[in-house]
Amino acid sequence: MFKPQSIYYEKEIENYELGKELLEKYKDVPKVIIENHNNIEEMRKKENDEFPKMKQNLIIGIRKTHKFVENHKTSDFLVPYTSSGCTAMCLYCYLVCNYNKCAYLRLFVNREQMLEKIIKTAQKSEKNLTFEIGSNSDLILENTITNNLVW
């Protein structure tokens, strides 16, 4: 099971039930308050060889954009959902070279807002829609931390 070495979090997560739960769950893990989960300067400055160490961090924030991308290959929409990134260290991973800032697991605590947008989009449609929520994250890993799959 994943146990983070440090947690970087947006202060606003304290206003969400899941945010409170995660801070309590990891109360003994060192924490750093950040302005934005998407721009952690300390992480952006790290060299690629620090990739394995970066994987030991957990970032907790609020997903601010809920943009659905039309897909039409495996679903109607690709939906950024309750997490992004992972904790694995696959040798072929493109994140280390291209997105050092995203080499770690990010969890988003505003799951109610994200689910609400999916539901509203589906209700507006005249046909049944398929939303792919797992293409940019590891929902199984995430579930071991958040228990989000019940959602």
List the predicted regions and their residue ranges.
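Short, flexible loop/turn elements at secondary-structure junctions
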Residues: K11-I13, T82-S84, S135-S137
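Local cysteine-cluster metal-coordination motifs and their immediate loop/turn environment
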Residues: Y81-N98
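Flexible, acidic/Gly-rich N-terminal and inter-domain linker regions that tether
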Residues: M1-D76
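A structural signal for short, well-ordered beta-strand segments and their strand-loop junctions
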Residues: Y8, I33, V79, L91, ...
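Short gly/ser-rich anion-binding loops that grip negatively charged ligand groups
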Residues: D76-S83, Y104
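Conserved Radical SAM active-site core
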Residues: E50-P52, I60-H72, L95-W151
